[in-house]
Amino acid sequence: MKNKYSDLIDQTFHFPTEEFKTTEEGELLYRDIPLMDLAKKYGTPFRFSYLPKISENIQKVKFWFADAFAEHNYNGSYNYCYCTKSSHYKYVIEEGLKNDIHLETSSAFDLDLIKKLHNEGLLGLDRFIVCNGFKTDLYIDKIIELIEMGFENLHVVLDNTREFHLLKGRTEKKIKLGIRIAAEEEPKFEFYTSRLGIGYRYIVPFYEDLIKNEPNMELKMLHFFINTGIRDTAYYWNELRKCLNVYAKLKAVCDTIDSLNIGGGFPIKRNLNFNYDYAYMTVSYTHLTLPTI
């Protein structure tokens, strides 16, 4: 009779996995690291970061996009931006930077990290710095400070007109802007974020009425964020196509826009039953065609 917990695992999941396995003595290992040793040393629950996996995943996603681009003769480029709010630990960010990546920030605190990384010689002025999140007065102050320092590829993603007016007149240097689209929420999603960003039909007027005539501001990016992350659902692809329609309309009146920033990212493995075809989803992106306006 099978009545052990290990029997339930065997019947429910494919085990061992790429990450987890057990020894003959029944010890649980994560990538050959004995977890019981860590539990005895640090107590439970505990959380740790496995640094080699960070670089491995970044290189994987770069390969998937390069492969998909080659398949469709796409001449654009893919730039991976690490979102600092996912982990502010120095050793995590430094591991990511070993892979020629860029950074996305969400608060004034994050820009202190950017400044420190630059002062330590770990982050060049040519890196893309995508400033997302709600812009407090302090956040705006630090954005201007980095622009004055010479961060030539810092992009400020605007959520609303208020943020535009906070930036206006703050520096004589060029300010590169992005606009966040307020995507429609997935039906019955428990947390609503559509209040963040600018509605589809207001984006072109927002550019033409406010940004277009500012001599030191240029629109470079459209930011698309879905809170579920990148999923193979009709809802997700429908929202992305709507975003591409807006991008095409913007491109028709704004020759400086050249980037589509995809937020949310790929889902990560949080349980043994996780199944997601990353390579397929990457290729699916390149099957989408930009509308002709």
Task: Please name every model-derived segment.
Residues 2-137:
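N-terminal capping/small domains of soluble enzymes
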Residues 31, 47-54, 58, 160, ...:
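Generic structural signal for well-ordered, non-membrane alpha-helical segments
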Residues 57, 61, 206-209, 239-246, ...:
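A general structural detector for well-ordered alpha-helical segments in enzyme core domains, enriched
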Residues 74-259:
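Active-site-proximal beta-alpha core segment in soluble small-molecule metabolic enzymes
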Residues 227, 260-269:
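Glycine-rich beta-strand-to-loop/alpha-helix junction loops that act as flexible
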Residues 232-238, 269-281:
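Short glycine/threonine-rich loop-to-helix capping motif typified by GTGT followed
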Residues 286-292:
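Conserved small/polar residues in nucleotide/adenosyl-binding loops
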